[in-house]
Amino acid sequence: MEKPTSSTNGEKRKSPCDSNSKNDEMQETPNRDLVLEPSLKKMKTSEYSTVLVLCYRKTKKIHSNQLENDQS
């Protein structure tokens, strides 16, 4: 059997890709959770949504008195 060299000390070395991907996953997950939590809490606290209905009339309403005056 081979003896472990002094550089490895008998431990398996991880490839840079494996260690980077694990570190990235660990770092990204808490950041995403922190960003999503406040928006979810806001949605839970609002029970009812507000609906606004606006009516806009382009022409003015003409009174019957004005019609009589215009015709004469």
From Swiss-Prot:
Residues 10-35 have a biased composition (Basic and acidic residues). It holds the Pfam family SPAN-X. Residues 1-40 are annotated as: Disordered. Belongs to the SPAN-X family. This is Sperm protein associated with the nucleus on the X chromosome N5. The lineage of its organism: Eukaryota, Metazoa, Chordata, Craniata, Vertebrata.
